[in-house]
UniProtKB/Swiss-Prot annotation:
Catalyzes the last two steps in the biosynthesis of 5-methylaminomethyl-2-thiouridine (mnm(5)s(2)U) at the wobble position (U34) in tRNA. Catalyzes the FAD-dependent demodification of cmnm(5)s(2)U34 to nm(5)s(2)U34, followed by the transfer of a methyl group from S-adenosyl-L-methionine to nm(5)s(2)U34, to form mnm(5)s(2)U34. It is found in: Cytoplasm. This is tRNA 5-methylaminomethyl-2-thiouridine biosynthesis bifunctional protein MnmC. Its EC number is 2.1.1.61, 1.5.-.-. It comes from the Bacteria. Its cofactor is FAD. HAMAP family: MnmC. It holds the Pfam family Methyltransf_30. GO terms for cellular component: cytoplasm. It comes from Vibrio cholerae serotype O1 (strain ATCC 39541 / Classical Ogawa 395 / O395).
Length: 674
């Protein structure tokens, strides 16, 4: 079992100058005199910012920081980068990525109070407040200013978090801000392990600056490979130290059997699909300046599993913090942020009404009570008594439950179609409908993929397969061990009683509150592995209603659910056995079978065989609305060579070749789907 410590918020006091003081470390968060000026001098000026940005030929500049604290350093850099971009709109450098580690994050209320000291940063601080995440362990990604700024907040002890940051051999970080409380106040952080970890993540030429001039810090950084020197300190402080990495020693923490590759100089991509995976990925790539061509087999987007009227948005959590839970907790928070940002640009039916899971039988009760033992923040999930559940749901259920206050529902069809149409209007996406891709062929001489649809041939630098249950129509992904499950969702008219339901209700099925747009609820959904067509199933229609009656036999209002109108929608889900999506480079099945035939005996695996510039985003299952935005962000980060939004061990759990590798490690042959 993975052991994960819950995150404690910082305990603060405020001194006479109005400066926050840590109770844990008995130290101020920033200078009593002029904290913002000190930040600019110590961290921007000594890292030669913004001067370096003018000559940088990268698309994205990466800063890493020890100790997020009040976010002052981040806000100051954000302000400086916006000014740089406004003054230099044609500069090659387009985006800023800020990675920060924090063991004791401030609560949102303390963060807001601390930011009152800097009114000139208010416009940036308010955007941060809006999306400041819950204190969930590991990485929480926030995308700001439509992708101009990306903030990765790693919550937890830096000695645990730093090794989880996925790092390719060339490194990741352009500048280090070595901040945090004074070494004398926080000796656990300031050690050789930290300095060595900084060097491992650093790129060639990475700079470093810190407010302290402590000799052991300077010597430790030198031992780690940085060339450090003393410089004039800020204000009355005599000295501080700054420097740069002398020589980059290649380092990676990515296992060869789970390696992934970026597409160097990515300019354009073909996405095969048309559902929520395609729409979120297209949006995320377009933010990075990548031109998108969409090939959709249907006459318009969202005709498959993403075409429902109402879909629930809530996380899949586990009390033992297994891989699924560690993916879905940050994925849900990112989805919530992402959906709110999308709602500022397009219209789609949605309601953050909360989601309530009923303890309707002994098995469900045991499972949900076990989940609550995971010590999650109550803003994410909390247990409710039967009486509290009745009040929360709006109709009598007389069952205890767990409630997700930040959850809700949205119309996936409207979201998917709205995103794709918006990108097309902006000239960032070209869509080809009724264009199924029959064949993919890699052209070594041009380093391009050739796509065939009927008699028509197209060429693209990079291809992503995001076609849901149709993943096996192409030879490159035909062997992926994914399943297909048909689902039928029933549309039922509301009644006076049913209209009182004000939370998504989950039991052995689910029921949504009424949509104010059409006066209907959604109830479902069936699971059928035998019949994978899109035809209406009268038995599934009856069973959708019967599940609610079965789970709440003492209540009369479920009898008002009328499925007799036979209104419904059918789709086929693409599912994985371990409940996690398949995200990343597509492995070359035949070569992997050969190269890893004796993997169980190999001391160190050779790098896994991957198709060049070919990726997959499939297997989103029943929780695609909660996972798709972060999975798209993860894949875009991988394709573009950006920092990853999840720990390196979780990337292994999402790798499209993971099940093949697991089987081969056990000495079993890959003769058929795993």
């Amino acid at each position: 079992m993975f052991i994960m410590s819950s995150i404690s918020h910082a305990q603060l006091g405020w001194n006479d100058a109005g400066t926050p003081v840590s109770d844990q470390f008995d130290d101020v968060y920033f200078s009593n005199v002029n904290g913002l000026a000190e930040t600019r001098y110590v961290f921007l000026e000594q890292n030669h910012l913004p001067q370096r940005w003018h000559n940088d030929d990268q698309r994205r500049f990466v800063i890493a920081e020890t100790g997020f604290g009040t976010g002052l350093n981040f806000l100051a850099v954000w302000q400086a980068f916006v000014a740089f971009r406004e003054a230099n709109p044609d500069a090659k450098l387009k985006e800023l990525h800020f990675i920060s580690f924090e063991k004791y994050p401030l609560s949102k209320s303390d963060l807001i109070q601390a930011h009152q000291a800097w009114p000139e940063l208010a416009q940036f601080a308010q955007k941060l407040h809006k999306h400041y995440p819950l204190a969930i362990p590991e990485c929480q990604r926030i995308v700001l200013d439509d992708g101009l700024i990306t903030l990765d907040l790693w919550f937890g002890d830096i000695k645990d978090c730093l090794p989880k940051v996925a790092t390719q051999e060339q490194g990741l970080v352009d500048a280090w801000f070595l901040d945090g409380f004074a070494p004398s106040k926080n000796p656990e952080m300031w050690n050789q392990g930290l300095f060595a970890g900084m060097a491992k993540l650093a790129k060639h030429g990475c700079t470093c600056a810190t407010f302290t001039s402590a000799g052991f810090v300077r010597r430790g950084l030198i031992d780690a490979g940085f060339a450090m020197k003393k410089v004039k300190g800020f204000g009355t402080k005599r000295e501080m130290i700054a420097g740069s990495l002398s020589e980059k020693v290649p380092y990676t923490n990515i296992a060869p059997e789970f390696r992934f590759e970026a597409t160097h100089g990515l300019q354009e991509v073909a996405i095969i699909g048309g559902g929520i995976a395609s729409a979120t990925l297209a949006t995320t790539l377009a933010r990075r300046g990548v031109a998108v061509t969409l090939y959709c087999a249907d006459e318009k987007p969202a005709q498959g599993a993403s075409g429902n009227r109402q879909g629930a948005v809530y996380p899949l959590l586990s009390g033992d913090h297994n891989a699924v839970s560690r993916v879905f907790a940050p994925a849900f928070l990112f989805a919530r942020q992402w959906i709110e940002q999308a709602a500022e640009q397009i219209n789609f039916d949605h309601d953050w009404c909360g989601v309530t899971q009923l303890m309707w039988d002994e098995k469900a009760t045991d499972k949900l009570k076990s989940m609550l033992e995971g010590d999650f923040p109550t803003q994410l999930v909390r247990g409710l008594s039967a009486e509290q559940t009745n009040q929360q749901v709006g109709v009598p259920v007389d069952k205890a439950s767990v409630h997700y206050p930040l959850g809700g529902w949205l119309c996936p069809a409207e979201l998917t179609q709205g995103l794709i149409h918006l990108l097309a209007q902006q000239g960032k996406l070209t869509a080809h409908y009724q264009t199924p891709i029959d064949e993919l062929t890699w052209q070594p001489e041009t380093q391009l993929w050739q796509l065939r649809s009927g008699d028509t041939l197209m060429s693209h630098q990079c291809v992503v397969i995001a076609s849901g249950h149709q993943f096996d129509s192409l030879s490159q992904t035909a062997e992926l061990p994914l399943g297909k499950v048909k689902g039928q969702v029933s549309h039922i008219p509301t009644t006076e009683t049913l209209s009182k339901i004000n939370s998504v209700l989950c039991y052995d099925g689910y029921m949504t509150p009424v949509s104010q747009q059409n006066g209907y609820h959604c109830i479902g959904a069936s699971y059928d592995r035998q019949h994978l067509d899109a035809t209406f199933d009268p038995q599934a229609q009856r069973e959708n209603a019967q599940k609610l009656i079965h789970c709440l036999p003492e209540q009369t209002w479920p009898l008002e659910v009328d499925v007799g109108g036979n209104q419904s929608r059918q789709g086929v889900r693409c599912v994985s056995r371990d409940h996690l999506p398949f995200v990343g480079n597509v492995g070359e099945f035949s070569k992997i079978t050969e190269q890893y035939r004796d993997l169980a005996q190999q001391q160190e695996a050779e790098p896994i065989a991957l198709y060049p510039q070919l990726y997959a985003l499939v297997g989103l299952g029943s929780r695609g609305l909660s996972s798709a935005p972060l999975m798209a962000e993860l894949l875009a980060s991988q394709m573009c060579g950006d920092p990853m939004p999840l720990g390196v061990d979780l990337l292994e759990q999402l790798h499209p070749s993971r099940m093949w590798v697991r089987k081969l490690r056990k000495g079993k042959a890959l003769t058929q789907k795993v």
